[in-house]
Amino acid sequence: MVFSYYKKLSAAQKRIYEQSDAIITVPLPDAGELQLLIPLLSSALTREDREQVEAVCRKLTLGMADRLAVPPLRVKVLAIRPSASWGELHGLYEPAEGRASAVISLWMRTAKHRRVVAFKSFLRTLLHELCHHLDYELYKLPDSFHTEGFYKRESSLFHQLIKEQLPADPNK
């Protein structure tokens, strides 16, 4: 399945889109060690501790970058999401391009109600922005498009980091 904007892409962009769409998982070595950071992130968000949220996000992204052998990147966690008529900005990936490293910016509060973003939404936003980094640095794509494969890669990382506790099976 291709998204509606696909038909507006140039032939070269369509090739990049198709390459991106074909990659659906990101195998994350030793994810178990990174899973230990997830409760810390959840707790820091619950406590509304921006500095701790940023520190845990940095550890998480540096750990993933190291395991995936891509350049490290900086993470900034900011207060209230920017918004306009187009909606709210959840996260932003800025490639290195002249900087020492790429930067992910995340906002931990919604624009309208200024509430702390739900934990899973916040984590997915972090992983979404990291996937842009992986498109450039791991997969060496010249551009990073939102494809079905892109969203599957984001989910792949999410499910490797979040091990949902399933209810106990009464038959076992």
What are these regions (language model features)?
Residues D49-A102, L161-P170:
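Auxiliary, metal-adjacent structural segments of Zn-dependent hydrolase domains
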Residues R47, Y139-L141:
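Short histidine/acidic/glycine/proline-rich micro-motifs that form metal-
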Residues L141-K172:
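Post-HExxH zinc-binding segment in Zn-dependent metallohydrolases
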Residues L62-D66, H132, S156:
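A generic structural signal for well-ordered alpha-helical segments enriched in polar/charged residues
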Residues R81-K120, H133-E137, H146-L157:
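Active-site scaffold of zinc-dependent metalloenzymes
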Residues S121-L130:
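Short alpha-helical catalytic segment bearing the HExxH-like zincin motif
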